[in-house]
């Protein structure tokens, strides 16, 4: 029997790796992929909670999470597309218009 | 019926508001009608009030309670007794005549509506001063007339001399008013009342009280009386605060007639008479009043001997005559002082308006040595001026004789040790008064014209709107003396105590007549018979002449003692140091501080998205750690 | 199932998912990253299967792999990113990022070590009961989710539309 904490550790590890990747990479699209990694880590956590508490609510939540993640990927990519089309920039550290 | 007397105050106020707000947009004719009619309305209602007072009633009415706070109750109310009735008549009647005169005098002036507005405001303030039944209304009116005087003296504000004169008048007035305010405060602290009817019964209770100042015990009533007198000195242009009145001649001549002859400058005398219970209890204060009055009147008369500007001579004459009024009050003959106020209003206003008429004809020229022989071309002005001069010289039959004689008799017959000295000074001044007044008459109206023939052709008599008031005032100057004011005022003003037998009054009367006639004869001799004498006299006594011509150098003294040091401090210390360094340092320094702080914090926002993400994560970690540790 | 096999599978998933995600974030080539992401998603679907959530597995494969990842590949293709010679992968402040991330991970590990594991586990789950739950208790979020999807669709189209300026000229 695998304890719940192991799945949660797995989820935490994946989430942190996704977080580190989001903060480190310059490429905008890779940043979006790291967001997807984070989402999936959270889905694993929800699903494991659902399994260990024998409650189907966790799976419903995963459903919603997947749907919302899909929407967010759409919008994110659209923004990146518009950005690249207008300015030709596709690296995050070159977009500094909102600098103080 | 009593509450309708507030209309006396409201009519001029309405005239002021009307003219100041919409005077610009309506024709001058409407402006002048509004100004004159408002004063006429006041006069009519005042006559009703005076009629009631004649029948022996005193009117007191409180309109509105302004401040009600524990012990302090200040209300707007009026008290019309015999004294107020006299003042009401003077202000309204002479004021009305001067308004009519101004319609002609100020014709065509671009500031016409403003002039009438301010003149109405002045009458309102003066009426408030005389009609008030408490010290606060007195002070309010006091300050307001000072303010209107400033407005009207500096009426032609484009001229630097005029605006400077206005400032000088207001500032010198303010210095006196400071003492006045201190007097009112001191009085209030001790009697806790401000209405006249509440104060006067409590004054005898204050006798003997002293105030301890820096170790000296000063009698309280004397101190109050002297402080109040400070205000009178400033307002009525006595020594040492007389310097503003000659400069005030920069204003239009009707203003000089109304404010600086008949009404505002007599407010000091009115105040002393109104508060006579206070003055009556302090010998020292009465002595100060009398001696100040005597010295001022002599002093101003000597200056007037050598001046060349017609209005300035009459201004010094005003200072001198008010000195007489203060002599009367100082000798506890308040009735005589008010009597002289009453007659003086008529003849002094007449003198000023005559001078205005001459100015009108001479295209603004005022130097009497540029005029001459005007009586042929300006008969009405000449005759009224002659009547006024005879009155001021104290010739029997005219009103000035009666009032001046009362004062000199009170001085002579008083029990005080300095009484006879003041009488002597007063009689000499009477001679001087006659001299300089007839000097104007003879130099300007007799003899040959000293200017160019074209100017002489331009000389014309003034239009009827200006001469009719002159005639009315001349008639008044003659007849008002026959109505015994001191007798009328007896219910409110105590009679003076005479320490000399009544027969000596004839002697005193004769002496003053001789003084007056002597003055006239000498003036006639010097200026008509032998006109070279004056030049020779000036050369022989050139030192004295120079001092008199420069008005005893008082203005220069004040400039040296007060004006220049103040300006020096203001510029060097206050402006350079306090203003620029400290205040501007703070005012500029705070934004600079904020800016610098902002500059320090600014680099946090780099615009890099991931850096913000790192900050967020760090924040979450810290937050969770804090929560978990708790 | 045999606990040992479970643990073997768990270890395998742990290692592979970790390596795959590191590969996603550390690849030079974007397409490589995309494919590593694909394998990652399939592994996650396998974990769902392990947790007795078959419906989720199917949905994961259909939506994520078939939808989102395809979208990523299309986007990379459309954007025509010119591969610069030796372009930098990481931002300047990556050290700060790494440290913060490790701190985060450490914090999570410390916290999650204390989680207790309950005994009764989900035996089986079927779509029927999932659907019953979805359409009764979670009906409102379901409807709102449909709205969200609609808006995301419209928004995506509007943002990524070619403006008339882009159409001509360029």
UniProtKB/Swiss-Prot annotation, chain A:
Belongs to the complex I subunit 4L family. This is NADH-quinone oxidoreductase subunit K. GO terms for molecular function: NADH:ubiquinone reductase (non-electrogenic) activity; quinone binding. Its EC number is 7.1.1.-. It is found in: Cell inner membrane. It comes from the Bacteria. The chain crosses the membrane at residues 4-24, 29-49, 60-80. GO terms for biological process: ATP synthesis coupled electron transport. GO terms for cellular component: NADH dehydrogenase complex; plasma membrane. Its main location: membrane. Keywords: Cell inner membrane, Cell membrane, Membrane, NAD, Quinone, Translocase, Transmembrane, Transmembrane helix, Transport, Ubiquinone. Pfam families: Oxidored_q2. NDH-1 is composed of 14 different subunits. Subunits NuoA, H, J, K, L, M, N constitute the membrane sector of the complex. It comes from Thermodesulfovibrio yellowstonii (strain ATCC 51303 / DSM 11347 / YP87). The gene is nuoK.
